[in-house]
Amino acid sequence: MSVKEKIPAFNTQEDLESYISLNAYTKVYGDFKMDLHAVEAYIQEHVKPKTKVFHSTKERLDFLVKNDYYDENIINMYSFEQFEEITRKAYAYRFRYANFMGAFKFYNAYALKTFDGKWYLENYEDRVVMNVLFLANGNYNKALKLLKQIITNRFQPATPTFLNAGRKKRGEFVSCYLLRIEDNMESIGRAITTTLQLSKRDGGVALLLTNIRESGAPIKKIENQSSGIIPIMKLLEDSFSYANQLGQRQGAGAVYLHAHHPDVMQFLDTKRENADEKIRIKSLSLGLVIPDITFTLAKNNEEMALFSPYDVYEEYGKPLSDISVTEMYYELLANQRIKKTFINARKFFQTVAELHFESGYPYILFDDTVNRRNAHPNRIVMSNLCSEIVQPSTPSEFHHDLAFKKVGNDISCNLGSLNIAKAMESGPEFSELVKLAIESLDLVSRVSNLETAPSIQKGNSENHALGLGAMNLHGFLATNQIYYNSPEAIDFTNIFFYTVAYHAFKASSELALEKGKFKNFENTKFADGSYFDKYIKVEPDFWTPKTERVKALFQKYQVEIPTRENWKELALNIQKNGLANSHLLAIAPTGSISYLSSCTPSLQPVVSPVEVRKEGRLGRIYVPAYQLNKDSYPFYKDGAYELGPEPIINIAAAAQQHVDQAISLTLFMTDKATTRDLNKAYIYAFKKGCSSIYYVRVRQEVLEDSEDHTIQMQQCEACVI
């Protein structure tokens, strides 16, 4: 019987492509191998008929350069013979999509097309070639090494890089931006202008509202004049809607507010389902910055004071964001010159939980947790759209015409991810893999043009901050027959990221010999060595596998675990030579690139062994988990909702010990969960040392024949790499 003869009878539409029907077998009949037939049918029926044919590599390259598809500056770094050889080697790897979703995602979102959208101009191998040419920056031998890492799915650049590398008409290579807004009209106006510029260049932008004076605060000493933060949120939401990135999608933005800002309850109310249209915020993401003191007050069932940012600045000469509310809480409380209002701390957390059930927002950044880990002198005051970027920033000052009086430091980050399963399979090449990944992200930071946002350009040029992450943890665990909620899973996560951290710091230290140190290195905990005490001032066996299973896995894959002596030597080298990058690791959600790589997202468990996605006109697409078969199925059977928040938090906490930034941590709750259950999850994540909480996803009760169980939320495609 042929593949097409196996199409199930329930697909009766005459124009329905066979690959849709074949993919449906994955869910309807549990025949996971049929998804590979769907890939084959998709390539034959859809891709090949729409792919422009060239008779030689030279003809193709000449066409793409002449017609402004490829950037000749990238092409000209190499001889034609080198380009031809890299292309030949790329195709020699005989890359195959592991599932239908991976093929669909590539051709729908990444492949270069003619300007009229009618013809494909690239296969996966061609896109990888353009990435390695760009990331190797003219170094032919390095391009060949990178080719191996990317085309075997060991390392995956973030969407903005993978999509835009080598293109003549492109967006930026940078995934996300973070901007401070200070308490004056010039800063507000400049932030909106910068937001428009960054959003149209495909970036997701997060902005800080903590320092804006509250509603009713004085203006020019006249009381009850300020409108507070809500009108600014409305302006920002309209700006993101207008800058719709060449019509492809609406711009993505988030705003962060400190929990002790007087407008915090109105801030949360903007996401209420029944909010008045005058204040309702539909597409802007919300984030809360919550310090330790808030949890203490809630534990003691006390009132929490909300402090006027206007008065704090007048009294201390510092914005509210730049002080530790936990350390200064009782001083601020006693200061009669600081206006304050009060709400019940437990009521505050109950409201946060209610909003999570209604909308999935707000994100949560644990203020004191991230600042205790901060190796740098200035405070971390916010995060990004996916809550994995945590870096210090400093304010800018402006003239009345919005020109800069003083350029502060704002934040960008260059992202990419290791595929944990493939990285482990790299064995003795593990260190080279991490080194090449760090060098690739560093290159992106050095070639990105961020002149439209001078404060971000300054932050990037001084810090070259990176965010190397990881994905496919559940995939690796399941294929090695380890349950996600087992001690072995936590043990593996701990040792894996311990090993990645060592090689990442080593790579950046070696880069510093070539590129120089990041600007303020001498004032950091890296320079005095104290950051590395956790690896050095411990017993020799402290950072070693605690289970025989994990010890055996590292031996099986021949991945060497760094020793305490390795760290001692590295710490001394870093003190001597410095680091090229202020930040190295951050674990993003990896939505798109996980589908592209046919692997499980980030460190999260799968929602189910076969995920159901809704993709435009195609309708439902069924996505089997990484290497799903009868052997791995039991280890995928309990998905994120069945597992609940505790195992996910345990995994994130294990990794967070070694990640110098944060981890996009999504909590999954069933429809039976209560606000009390959510509050327990916040407290557990807080106590375990997690840096942040991303979305809260709630599986709702739905009609029996519906498969859309989860609250759908707008996500930043630039950030959910």
UniProtKB/Swiss-Prot annotation:
GO terms for molecular function: ATP binding; ribonucleoside-diphosphate reductase activity, thioredoxin disulfide as acceptor. The gene is nrdE. The record marks 183, 213 as: Allosteric effector binding. It is an enzyme of class 1 (oxidoreductase). It comes from Mycoplasma pneumoniae (strain ATCC 29342 / M129 / Subtype 1). This is Ribonucleoside-diphosphate reductase subunit alpha. Keywords: Allosteric enzyme, ATP-binding, Deoxyribonucleotide synthesis, Disulfide bond, Nucleotide-binding, Oxidoreductase. Gene3D superfamilies: 1.10.1650.20, 3.20.70.20. Tetramer of two alpha and two beta subunits. The record marks 176, 413 as: Important for hydrogen atom transfer. The active site is at residues 384, 386, 388. It catalyses: a 2'-deoxyribonucleoside 5'-diphosphate + [thioredoxin]-disulfide + H2O = a ribonucleoside 5'-diphosphate + [thioredoxin]-dithiol. Under complex allosteric control mediated by deoxynucleoside triphosphates and ATP binding. The type of nucleotide bound at the specificity site determines substrate preference. It seems probable that ATP makes the enzyme reduce CDP and UDP, dGTP favors ADP reduction and dTTP favors GDP reduction. The record marks 694-695 as: Important for electron transfer. The record marks 716, 719 as: Interacts with thioredoxin/glutaredoxin. It comes from the Bacteria. InterPro entries: NrdE_NrdA_C, RNR_1b_NrdE, RNR_lg_C, RNR_lsu_N, RNR_N, RNR_R1-su_N, Rrm1. One of its GO terms (cellular component) is ribonucleoside-diphosphate reductase complex. Its EC number is 1.17.4.1.
